[in-house]
Amino acid sequence: QKVQAKLQVPNIGLVPFYGYIDRLDKQGNTLRVIDYKTGKALMEYRDMEHIFDRKENQDKALQTMLYCWLLEQDKPQLLSNTAHIAPHIYPVRSMAKADEVQTLVHQKGNTDFVWNEEVKAEFIEGLSTLLRELFDPAVPFMPTAVGKRCEHCAFAALCK
């Protein structure tokens, strides 16, 4: 399911985003936004700062949150009769096991993530801050401090 939207970022303008959601399904009154992953995915977070912290391995959680926002912006008709949107990861290696879909959970209290207006506002603020940093010519691009990310990166040779 292709989803797309533009985000108005102060001092930058409209920034287009798009993505392909691997699967949408309904469980009770929750619409699950599911992304298939071939590797491990950390689906725990402390707070929104944790999601945007580049020293943390939160790219999969960030991606699924982005899909929730894109879905809400681009396909609101899919959200009718839905109380919640929830990001999930489905590790491909676990597909033989029953119900191995991993829900994003909050580390405090181990509660499931709920996409609501407060979380959405925090997410948009974090995303806007990240984009302002990326577009700021005074901020140099730096290689990641997480060396494992370089293993499959097509640009790894440029950083060394």
Residue ranges and their predicted role:
Residues Q1-K160:
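RecB-family 4Fe-4S metal-dependent nuclease core
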